[in-house]
Amino acid sequence: MVAIIVHGGAGTIRKEERIPKVLEGVREAVLAGWKELKKGSALDAVEEAIKVLEDNPIFNAGTGSVLTIDGKVEMDAAIMRGKTLEAGAVAGIWGVKNPISVARKVMEKTDHVLLVGEGAVKFARIMGFPEYDPTTEERRKQWQELKEKLMKGEVRHWKKLGELIKEHPEVLRSTVGAVAFDGEEVVAGTSTGGVFLKMFGRVGDTPIIGAGTYANEVAGASCTGLGEVAIKLALAKTATDFVRLGLDAQAASEAAIELATKHFGKDTMGIIMVDSRGNVGFAKNTKHMSYAFMKEGMNEPEAGV
């Protein structure tokens, strides 16, 4: 049974009026992915769904990515095929519209898994991806306001990211992702602009295979939230291990988030999954995580936050 699920990031949506736009965005993405999935390719479905999310400035990936501490955009993305364990990823890339498509090219056109920074940008140009500025005025304004807020008072040094997020949940702008099963294989993909005010050069879980993105013959997972948590727990791979041990995608998602909460507390993580039986799963320990999914037999996607 074929299935696809997408997420638009875990965290706190401060402005309630944004929720309908977020729901519309994940619905649009899952429908675009479903269209490709019905043609038979989970790989095309995952890439297309994530491209739609990257192109929507309400999400923190591609256009509308958040800014680093020095006001720049550095994006991460990864994609992985469960049948062959082929994977491609980029980290700290800038000047491209769709990092997920560059990640796919890394998988298909090189012997490598991960390209970073200037090397990733050079590779993108060689592959024909044109120069593109993903910065939006809204993100620039948010960056200025947040930086001013943090600079007020007696703060003489930058606090650890985890402490900042507890005091200012809006820092956690999270990630987008998709996981699909086409009847033959599971594919997972994730893309992000990272965390607001992250240090230059910071890489989160998204492009780390096994941490934020993973797929094998039994399941696939895409994580969202505070990347350092997913890295330390190898959370995407761990979630698929739960499926190998007999859980379905939903139970495995819940088990993965319980693990994250146990070790690192609430407001840290969300996950989506699909297993090789066509089950979808999603769980979070944050206030919100936008998601939408389609399975065989459904006429319309189910979506929520």
UniProtKB/Swiss-Prot annotation:
Pfam families: Asparaginase_2 (PF01112). Autocleaved. Generates the alpha and beta subunits. The N-terminal residue of the beta subunit is thought to be responsible for the nucleophile hydrolase activity. Gene3D superfamilies: (Glycosyl)asparaginase. Keywords: Autocatalytic cleavage, Hydrolase, Protease. SUPFAM superfamilies: N-terminal nucleophile aminohydrolases (Ntn hydrolases). Absence of L-glutaminase activity, ability to remain active at a wide range of pH and temperature and long term stability at cell culture conditions suggest that this enzyme is a good therapeutic candidate for the treatment of colorectal cancer and hepatocellular carcinoma. Transmembrane segments: none annotated. GO terms for biological process: proteolysis. Its EC number is 3.5.1.1. It comes from the Archaea. One of its GO terms (molecular function) is asparaginase activity. Displays activity at a broad temperature range and is highly thermostable. Optimum temperature is 80 degrees Celsius. CDD domains: Ntn_Asparaginase_2_like (cd04512). Optimum pH is 8. Exhibits activity from pH 5 to 10. The record marks S174, T175 as: Cleavage. Substrate binds at R202, V203, G204, D205, T224, G225, L226, G227. One of its GO terms (cellular component) is cytoplasm. The active site is at T175. L-asparaginase is an enzyme of therapeutic importance in the treatment of cancer, especially lymphomas and leukemia. It functions by reducing the availability of circulatory L-asparagine to tumor cells. This P.abyssi enzyme shows 78% to 55% growth inhibition of cultured human caco2 and HepG2 cells when subjected to an incubation time of 48 hours. Belongs to the Ntn-hydrolase family. Catalyzes the hydrolysis of L-asparagine into L-aspartate and ammonia. Does not exhibit glutaminase activity. Heterotetramer of two alpha and two beta chains arranged as a dimer of alpha/beta heterodimers. The uncleaved protein forms homodimers. This is Plant-type L-asparaginase. It comes from Pyrococcus abyssi (strain GE5 / Orsay).
